[in-house]
């Protein structure tokens, strides 16, 4: 190797290494809510900053999640997913008796199966939500034997009514709602998306305990994913406007370290008006 080639490699190699290590996505950030097992989970999300390829998930639980997305083409949707009891990523390989059942689906809701990160059933409702708009979600759980039916409801402010989107039933061993959480995810993952900020506030969360009493969700623990392709440092969470905020990507600066237990003001004495399940 001649002297000129050696100098060229010395100059270029750090750039190549830097390019290879550049994050492809903003880091997924979560709020985990300490709560008892529940028959209903209500939560609100207000998106302040979004970009194509963003998922703002309001009502997550062991076996499913429910929220809003801005897809890669800019289309806005409401999405609700529930997992099969079977393990694996091939949706077609799951035996019929282990697949999620669709007990109810609104006419303008699309439902189908998914694979790739577990398998199960998911539904999509076209809804052009806006930044600054508070979106409201309710998930209920009804146990019958070893199965649980999870119903997803979304509030339509223009009609001032709740819309029952879908009810999925899956094998749970007879469990109700547990392991409650929210998150923000960058699913575009094209490098540029790591440089773009996503910010939302999750507020006024409530759970209905198995015996029927409603309890506010006033604490949440800050968490984040550990995928190697994500930007690790540009994450944040905290308390603002009576709720919990999550932020990731772009020029985000951390004000509270991971694992911080956040506490919001108690707020209302009871949840807002909800549909009768």
Across the structure, where does each feature detected by a protein language model lie?
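Local beta-strand/beta-hairpin segments that build beta-sheet-rich folds
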Residues: 22, 159-168, 217-219
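Secretory/extracellular carbohydrate-interaction modules
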Residues: 21-109, 267-276
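Bacterial N-terminal signal peptides that target proteins for export
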Residues: 1-8
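Carbohydrate-binding surfaces in secreted/extracellular proteins
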Residues: 129-163
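Short beta-strand segments enriched in hydrophobic/aromatic residues
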Residues: 45-49, 84, 141-143, 156, ...
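Bacterial Sec-dependent signal peptides at the C-terminal "C-region" and cleavage site
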Residues: 11, 15-22
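Activation corresponds to long, low-complexity, non-globular regions
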Residues: 22-55, 180, 184, 189-277
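Short, aromatic/His-centered strand-loop micro-motif at the edge of beta-sheets
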Residues: 114-134
């Amino acid at each position: 190797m001649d002297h000129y080639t050696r100098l060229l490699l010395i100059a270029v190699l750090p750039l190549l290494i830097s390019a290879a290590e550049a994050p492809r996505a903003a880091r997924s950030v979560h709020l985990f809510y300490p709560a008892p097992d529940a028959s209903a989970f209500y939560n609100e999300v207000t998106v302040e900053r979004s970009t194509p390829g963003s998922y703002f998930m309001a009502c997550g639980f062991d076996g499913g999640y429910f929220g809003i997305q801005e897809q890669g083409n800019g289309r806005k949707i409401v999405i609700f997913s529930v997992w099969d009891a079977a393990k694996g990523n091939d949706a077609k390989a799951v035996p019929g008796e282990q697949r999620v059942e669709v007990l109810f689906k609104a006419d303008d809701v699309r439902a189908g199966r998914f694979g790739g990160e577990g398998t199960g059933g998911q539904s999509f409702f076209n809804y052009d939500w806006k930044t600054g708009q508070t979106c409201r979600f309710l998930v209920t759980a009804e146990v019958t034997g070893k199965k649980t039916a999870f119903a997803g409801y979304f509030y339509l402010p223009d009609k001032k009514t709740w819309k029952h989107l879908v009810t999925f039933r899956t094998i749970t061993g007879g469990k109700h709602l547990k392991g409650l959480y929210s998150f923000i995810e960058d699913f575009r993952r094209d490098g540029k998306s790591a440089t773009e900020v996503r910010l939302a506030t999750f507020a006024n969360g409530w759970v209905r305990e198995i015996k029927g009493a409603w309890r506010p969700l006033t604490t949440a623990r800050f968490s984040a994913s550990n995928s190697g392709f994500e930007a690790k440092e540009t994450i944040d969470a905290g308390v603002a406007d009576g709720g919990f905020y999550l932020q990731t990507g772009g020029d985000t600066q951390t004000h509270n370290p991971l694992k911080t237990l956040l506490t919001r003001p108690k707020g209302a004495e009871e949840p807002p008006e909800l549909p009768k399940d």
